[in-house]
Amino acid sequence: MLNAREEEVLNVIIENVKLKGYPPSVREIGEAVGLSSSSTVHSYLKRLEQKGYLRRDPTKPRAIEVIMSELSKNPSSHPLTSELSRYSDEELISIPLLGEVAAGVPLLAVENYDEKVTLPRSFTGYGEFFMLSVRGDSMIEAGILPGDLVLVRRQESVSNGDIAVALLEDEATVKRFYKEKNRIRLQPENSLLSPIYVQEVKILGKVVGLMRKI
């Protein structure tokens, strides 16, 4: 059983993932529940992990994972279960982590199917997906930070303003896409950096979400 504060912390994580596609930071959790000390927030996260409600891997850039099966063992025991019950095992999908993508200079995306990330289908929607680990800081003003994992839906075209993973001479980069009159602009979300202009580019997919280690 969770006490009121533990339940509040868990609910903040769930709601943030539902609304934004990635978990809140320790600071954001603290602000949401009225805790000014990051160490206190970490202690609550540790308790939730020990009780089987969360799983974290401090060695990898993964988001906090809410363990649905632990809650669903006794559906009447916890008020959050009704919100989480729709994430059944049948709705979980394994998404390959292909390597790194630069949010800065283009960087080769090395395919590595040995690593996978499991996500609820309701988070991803339908389609073919892969994930990439972000390096560089050119997308920080869009909330994409070094070490984040971006969730990418495979598609060959995107709309103006979409954040895309583009292939430039066999190197992948994540930028905001704009098709202009006689060129394509790959726009960083960092006011200190300049856009990349090209005549043509291969689109690998659209960034539809991200995960962050906290």
UniProtKB/Swiss-Prot annotation:
| Gene from which this protein is expressed | lexA
Q: Describe the family membership recorded for this protein in Swiss-Prot or TrEMBL.
A: Belongs to the peptidase S24 family.
Q: Which CDD domains match?
A: S24_LexA-like
Where does the record place the catalytic residues? 138 (for autocatalytic cleavage activity), 175 (for autocatalytic cleavage activity)
Query: Mind telling me what this protein is named?
Result: LexA repressor
Summarize the protein's role. Answer: Represses a number of genes involved in the response to DNA damage (SOS response), including recA and lexA. In the presence of single-stranded DNA, RecA interacts with LexA causing an autocatalytic cleavage which disrupts the DNA-binding part of LexA, leading to derepression of the SOS regulon and eventually DNA repair.
Chain positions of site Cleavage: 103-104
Q: Which HAMAP family match?
A: LexA
Q: What keywords were assigned to this record?
A: Autocatalytic cleavage, DNA damage, DNA repair, DNA replication, DNA-binding, Hydrolase, Repressor, SOS response, Transcription, Transcription regulation
Q: Name one GO biological process term.
A: proteolysis
Where, if anywhere, are coiled coils annotated?
A: none
What domain of life does the native source organism fall in?
Bacteria
The residues that make up the annotated DNA-binding region are 26-46
What do we know about how this protein assembles, alone or with others? Homodimer.
Q: Give the EC number(s) under which this enzyme is classified.
A: 3.4.21.88
Keyword match Transcription = yes
Q: Which SUPFAM superfamilies match?
A: LexA/Signal peptidase, Winged helix' DNA-binding domain
The reaction(s) this protein catalyses: Hydrolysis of Ala-|-Gly bond in repressor LexA
Organism equals Desulforamulus reducens (strain ATCC BAA-1160 / DSM 100696 / MI-1) (Desulfotomaculum reducens)
Q: Which GO terms describe its molecular function?
A: DNA binding; serine-type endopeptidase activity
